[in-house]
Swiss-Prot record:
Belongs to the eukaryotic ribosomal protein eS19 family. Component of the small ribosomal subunit (SSU). Mature yeast ribosomes consist of a small (40S) and a large (60S) subunit. The 40S small subunit contains 1 molecule of ribosomal RNA (18S rRNA) and at least 33 different proteins. The large 60S subunit contains 3 rRNA molecules (25S, 5.8S and 5S rRNA) and at least 46 different proteins. The lineage of its organism: Eukaryota, Fungi, Dikarya, Ascomycota, Taphrinomycotina. This is Small ribosomal subunit protein eS19B. The keyword Secreted does not apply. GO terms for biological process: cytoplasmic translation; ribosomal small subunit assembly. Component of the ribosome, a large ribonucleoprotein complex responsible for the synthesis of proteins in the cell. The small ribosomal subunit (SSU) binds messenger RNAs (mRNAs) and translates the encoded message by selecting cognate aminoacyl-transfer RNA (tRNA) molecules. The large subunit (LSU) contains the ribosomal catalytic site termed the peptidyl transferase center (PTC), which catalyzes the formation of peptide bonds, thereby polymerizing the amino acids delivered by tRNAs into a polypeptide chain.
Amino acid sequence: MAGVSVKDVDAQQFINAYAAFLKRSGKMTTPQWIDIVKTGTHKELAPYDPDWYYVRAAAIARHIYLRKQVGVGRLCKVYGGSVNRGMRPSHHRDGSGSVQRKVVQSLEKIGVLEKSDNGGRRISQQGQRDLDRIAYSLLEDEE
């Protein structure tokens, strides 16, 4: 297991595996409003996937793992998108700050993330160990 990190596996496979792990573990609590909320002003509908909250949490955990520290504002920019304005030129709209904030708070509550002294969040030692363990299991399954 030494030397295996999240960078060594495919992003989509890792996100799906970690989302399944988060759902299976049952430690992460989801808000009641996740089935009706949009993920940003640029979206017209709520997500179709009933497990989208776990997938978003896994993607955010991977995103923060690959960087030193990330704030909620940066996550809003990452998960934003282009707004449909008809014939007019499209513009970027940030994703929902509430969704990103609640996901980060959920990950912080289960010990994957911790607050950084410089602002934002960073991956904790326990979180890094969990993510590396998932990455190692994916590499084992591949071989």
